[in-house]
Regions:
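Extended C-terminal subregions enriched in glycine
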Residues: 388, 436, 469, 478-539
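Noncatalytic scaffold domains of N-terminal-nucleophile
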Residues: 24-54, 66-228, 233-235, 239-285, ...
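Internal maturation/activation junctions in enzymes
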Residues: 299-398, 410-411, 418, 538
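Active-site rim segments in enzyme catalytic domains, especially the processed small/beta chain
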Residues: 79-83, 89-104, 252-254, 390-455, ...
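Alpha-helical support elements that line or immediately flank enzyme active sites
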Residues: 59-60, 144-152, 228-235, 240, ...
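Bacterial N-terminal signal peptides that target proteins for export
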Residues: 1-9
């Protein structure tokens, strides 16, 4: 650990009092700031922006389904929070349909350009795919996802769902604090890419907190989609503009790549934990890491250890290390490298891997398991629920903040840089190939009890996402927190595991444990004695939204303070 990190830890050991002392001045009994859950009898929405939440509610009040509301809110977030998402990115969703009483999963991720080969990266002397510019760009799948979800579950016309965002894009809306912060950080990194400064700055700078932002180009693009449907984006003038732009700027994404795009309906997969069944989408995303971590934690009595105890943090971190070793080895596009999903999320496999966990010593090096096939496999998150009982868990992203920085002229959005997550090796499951989906970090979550819907939730934020999913559930199921407290509680994030992107070498030092402010000094000392390298950092620790089915009727919502968001209902 760097010397300054040791000094910071030492200072915090003195400055941070124990949990019981902190709890004394809060009526909730919790040692951290929180607020009330939100309850409503008919419908609920929770998003990372208050205006998007209101748009979702207005959509359902006008007769739209939870899917209509999710699409309307996602469109709004693409305008209002371009630091995390937009129609240049991908989309994943899980929908609970009250008519069929089952879950439906959608993988709306795009593929790499067919004309960009591994040999081209090698010709350029690259060992990693750049974070920005034309090379990491993959086909954006979000708009396709909207229309796929709408075609199965929508009630209102797509034009009605997009109308509020089109109006805000033309007339303007005030930029919120967290978004302004990340926007300001993005401008110096992305300003050199063609079209970014012209379309995403005000006189060369980011819009400030409270300042009005307009995006008439995006309004025109959304209007074209509203009028022409899905094909207006993938097979019309929008696709031609994108193809021409990349051809003129050393890029490879083409009209043909966009025209060939298809998303996929997929079956969610699950595991059980303390009487609850957690559902995630299968790879190429990382959702099953949350299932693996829960399976590894299940044998331990976390409730008796208590939230924030050394045992709680240690066990969570060790389980994460084991799951993420498999994540680096197995998670990839199943069309190219199918993962042994059923085995990876099985209880038997968790028992085998769990034998590596010691209560006394932190693992420093973790190899992936060798699961054999069983006989016979920056981001925004939002959730909505309607009066009919439909629930939507939806996540959408540009990948790294504002994406690649590549902003085709006149369109008002930025293309994602998801291709950065490929490995430039043929022998790796996540190795680059034309027409392939990269490993994905964005994952929606859903939980059921006794076959009935219970909780739609998500925690955006890269590798934090499966770690966040697990922490929300154990906060509720093991530590007795309510829906809002579960998201507001201080978080743990372990960094340093081997990555499926190939950008981290194999972990040999145990990685680093980042703790958000609020963990007691006794815990920090005990973790360090076990061999953990502990840091207190500003994060990010993700962004949480959730809706729970209220057992007394109606809905309960939550939205945490780490984002600009809001949960509201009617």
């Amino acid at each position: 650990m760097p010397r300054h990190a040791h000094l910071l830890s030492a200072l915090l050991l003195v400055a941070v009092p124990a949990l019981p002392a902190l709890a004394a001045d809060r009526i909730t009994g919790q040692p951290f700031a929180t607020r009330s859950e939100v309850h409503a009898p008919h419908a609920m929405a929770a998003t990372s922006h208050p205006l998007a939440t209101q748009i979702a509610l207005d959509t359902m009040k006008a007769g739209g389904s939870a899917v209509d509301a999710a699409i309307a809110a996602n469109a709004a977030l693409g305008l209002m929070e371009p630091t995390g998402n937009g129609i240049g990115g991908d989309l994943f969703a899980i929908v609970w349909d009250p008519k069929t009483k089952r879950l439906y999963g959608y993988d709306g991720s795009g593929r790499s350009p067919h004309s960009l080969t591994l040999a081209e990266f090698q010709r350029r002397g690259l060992t990693d795919i750049p974070s920005h510019g034309p090379l990491p760009v993959t086909v954006p799948g979000a708009v396709d996802g909207w229309f796929a979800l709408h075609g199965r579950f929508g009630k209102r016309a797509m034009a009605e769902n997009l109308a509020p965002t089109i109006r805000y894009a033309r007339e303007g809306h005030p930029v919120h604090e967290v978004i302004a912060y990340y926007w300001d950080r993005s401008v110096p990194r992305l300003g050199k890419w063609p079209g970014f400064t012209e379309q995403f700055t005000i006189d060369g700078r980011a819009p400030r907190n409270g300042e009005t932002w307009r995006n008439p180009n995006l309004a025109n693009t959304l209007q074209a989609i509203a009028d022409g449907g899905r094909d207006a984006f993938y097979k019309g003038d929008i696709a031609r503009t994108i193809g021409d732009y990349f051809a003129a700027n050393d890029g490879f994404l083409s009209y043909e790549d966009l025209a060939a795009h298809t998303g996929n309906w997929v079956e969610p997969v699950s595991t059980t934990y303390r009487g609850v069944e957690l559902w995630e989408l299968p790879p190429s995303g990382q959702g099953i890491a949350a299932l693996q971590i829960l399976n590894l934690l299940e044998p331990y009595d976390l409730e008796s250890y208590g939230f924030g105890s050394p045992e709680h943090v240690h066990l969570f971190v060790e389980a994460k290390k084991l799951a993420f070793a498999d994540r680096a080895r197995w998670y990839a596009d199943p069309a190219f490298h199918p993962a042994p999903v059923e085995r990876l999320i099985s209880k038997d496999y968790a028992r085998e891997r769990g034998a590596l966990i010691s209560m006394d010593t932190a693992l420093r090096e973790v190899q992936p398991g060798t699961p054999k096939q069983l006989d016979e496999g920056d981001t925004i998150y939002l959730t909505t629920a309607d009066a009919d009982g439909m629930m939507v868990s939806l996540i959408q992203s540009n990948y790294r903040g504002m994406g690649s920085g590549m902003a085709p002229p006149g369109l008002g959005f930025i293309l994602q840089d998801r291709g950065e997550q490929f490995v430039l090796r043929e022998d790796h499951p996540n190795g680059y190939a034309p027409g392939k989906r990269p490993f994905h970090t964005i994952i929606p979550a859903f939980a059921t009890k006794d076959g009935e819907p219970w909780l739609s939730f998500g925690v955006m934020g890269g590798a934090m996402q499966p770690q966040g999913h697990v922490q929300i559930l154990i906060n509720m199921l093991d530590f007795g927190m309510n829906l809002q407290e579960a998201g507001d509680a201080p978080r743990i994030q372990h960094d340093g595991s081997t990555e499926p992107t190939g950008q981290n070498t194999a972990m040999t030092d145990g990685g680093e444990v980042d703790l958000e402010t609020g963990f007691p000094y006794e815990t920090v000392r005990a973790l360090m004695q076990k061999g953990h390298s502990v840091r207190f950092s500003h994060g990010p620790y993700g962004g949480y939204q959730a809706i729970m089915k209220n057992p007394h009727g109606g809905w309960t919502g939550a939205s945490e303070s780490r984002k600009d968001g809001q949960a509201a209902g009617y």
